[in-house]
Amino acid sequence: MQLNKHHIPLFIKLSFWLFISIACVPLHAQTEIEESVADRDTLVADTLWNDNDSLFLKNDTLAWPQNVQKAIDELLQNDMFKTSQVGMLIYDLDADSVIYRHNERQLMRPASTMKVITAITALDKLGGGHRFKTDLCYTGRIDSCTLVGDVYCVGGFDPRFNVDDMHAFVEALRRMGVDTIRGNVYADKSMKDEDPYGEGWCWDDNNPVLSPLLFARKDKFIERFVSELQKAGIYITGTTGEQRKPDSANCIISRFHTIDQILMRMLKESDNLYAEAVYYQIAAATGNRPATAEHAHRVVQQLINKLGLNASRYSFADGSGLSLYNYVSAELEVRLLRYAYSNQLILNHLLPALPIAGVDGTLKARMRSPFTRSNVRAKTGTVMGVSSLCGYLTASNGHQICFSIINQGIMHAKNGRRFQDRVCSILCRP
């Protein structure tokens, strides 16, 4: 189709104004569109917070911390708080005093900031040298090239067990000269109970399976092990199944991953499976077998009581924060963060694993200003109706701060995140 001479001026005009309208969109608005597409909880445009909001700035006529307190007071006047709640506690670790408190004792669902509670409890109970172990054992004897007996893969709930570890298991048998297993191959999953999911998990979520013997995050360890044995030319005469390893069994090889390796992914990427693995390590450390989530709850409660709070006020159901039954407070999270800060054996393992604002993990796309970037180190949390953030930062006066912010009853988590980011910016900005 050809344009006649009457259509050309209109076409040119429309093209010109379309170009101008696109070119004149503010940079922050274009960025906002990209962020809303990437935002998992909603594609609804965020209208409650304006990036140019004057409330974002501190009152320079007031001294620290009054200027911070005034600015946060003004943030709390936002319309979102007419229909939602926030619990918040900000603590100056150098001055050993509270900077700001608001509903800090109100019970709320922590979402994935529960992982910080799990991490601190684990480091306190297990220590920074703890390792997640998976064993390969056998019973019977090795006669020539034949293992006459049974082989046991003993799970210690290591979520990082991978292809290299599996190959190491197979290679260990090859180095013993074994080309035939005249017996069965068993999965020993006795380390924990048989519950495949956490208490209070939503049935329609994509939840991880809580097995103590995993391969590549799946409960298919024995199937893959047998397949790798066959590829290596090792023949099995028996069957596969689940059975606890006898005390008399011989250990062929053990594969380990450190607690630092687990915490790094658990906190930076908010990995729920890793958090539950840590929680069951806490439970197993009590000496109970099989370990249960209830055993871990008790350890968490013991730590809370030791820190001077009443553990019976809170509810714990899992280690990841997926459960609908977890209820904590900003006061509790800050008390645990203070405890970790005062204990270098905990802090040296916790701090490097927390997401860093504007740099990595779940904070990579948040708080990119010069004052917050690489400064705020905190754990994020998001479940339906809840957005949370807790961790550490260095304030504008050089003081070390720990904080917890839990937004509850919000339809769109982005609104909670923006409030949290502004609070952190107020603390960091000169």
Show the residue positions of the predicted features.
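Bacterial Sec-dependent N-terminal signal peptides
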Residues: M1-S36, T42, T47
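Beta-lactamase-like hydrolase cores
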Residues: E32-D94, Y100-L107, E171-G177, R429
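Second-shell loop/turn segments in exported
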Residues: S54-A63, R101-R109, V151-R160, V170, ...
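Active-site SXXK
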Residues: D96, P110-G128, V185, R224-E228, ...
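Active-site-adjacent, His/Asp/Glu-enriched structural segments that form or flank metal-binding
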Residues: R131-D193, G200-P208, L214-F215
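A conserved catalytic-loop motif detector
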Residues: Y152, A168, S190-A232, S254, ...
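A small/polar active-site loop signature that marks catalytic segments
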Residues: K218-L351
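C-terminal soluble interaction/assembly domains
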Residues: S315-P430
